[in-house]
Swiss-Prot record:
The UniProt record lists the keyword Translocase: no
Keywords: Ribonucleoprotein, Ribosomal protein
Biased composition (Basic and acidic residues): 126-162
Protein name: Large ribosomal subunit protein bL17
Entries under HAMAP family matching the protein: Ribosomal_bL17 (MF_01368)
Family note: Belongs to the bacterial ribosomal protein bL17 family.
Disulfide bond sites: none
Renumbered residue ranges of the record's region Disordered: 118-162
Example of a GO cellular component annotation carried by this entry: cytosolic large ribosomal subunit
Gene Ontology biological-process annotations: translation
Database matches in Pfam families: Ribosomal_L17
């Protein structure tokens, strides 16, 4: 029975798991959106929300506590300056998980984890490329429907019937 057991092991050692989540939290705050597997995203949400809550306090002690998880000074400054101000009025729920399908190599369920009040200018180029591909497919579809095939008459069946 799993009484009072919190969190996922994700088939990693404790050191690997904590280092991975520290790196993922730093990447999430740097890019404001990352793509990862769904179990990692669900676990990362816990870390990220706690760090943002610490940043909202704005005290030197809160900065030291956040520095345990966010090891990059630039990202830490961004967290305490811009992100803390952005989420000042929000009582919680700073991140959103959106499922995007399955990964081609191992069929793992993938998700996008992003900050809720994300700036629209911070959109990655991958989305723009995806939109261009979708538009290209839509343009090709009418060309295929342009020339319908002529119906073939069953000549052999008519010849056998006579």
């Amino acid at each position: 029975m799993k009484h009072r057991v919190v969190g996922r092991r994700l088939d990693r050692t404790t050191e690997h798991r904590t280092a991975m989540f520290k790196n993922m939290v730093t990447s999430l705050f740097r890019h404001e959106r990352i793509v990862t597997t769904t179990p990692k995203a669900k676990e990362l949400k816990r870390f990220a929300d706690k760090v943002i809550t610490q940043a909202k306090r704005g005290t030197p002690h809160a900065r030291r506590l956040a520095h345990r998880n966010v090891r990059d000074v630039e990202v830490l400054n961004k967290l305490f300056d811009t992100l803390a101000e952005r989420f000042k009025a929000r009582p919680g729920g700073y991140t959103r998980i959106v499922r995007v399908g399955r990964r081609a190599g191992d069929n793992a369920e993938m998700s996008v984890i992003e900050l809720v009040d994300r700036a629209p200018a911070a959109a990655p180029e991958a989305e723009e490329k995806g939109e261009k591909k979708a538009a290209g497919k839509a343009e090709k579809a009418p060309k295929a429907a342009k020339a319908p095939k002529a119906e073939k008459k069953p000549a052999k069946k008519a010849a056998k019937a006579e």
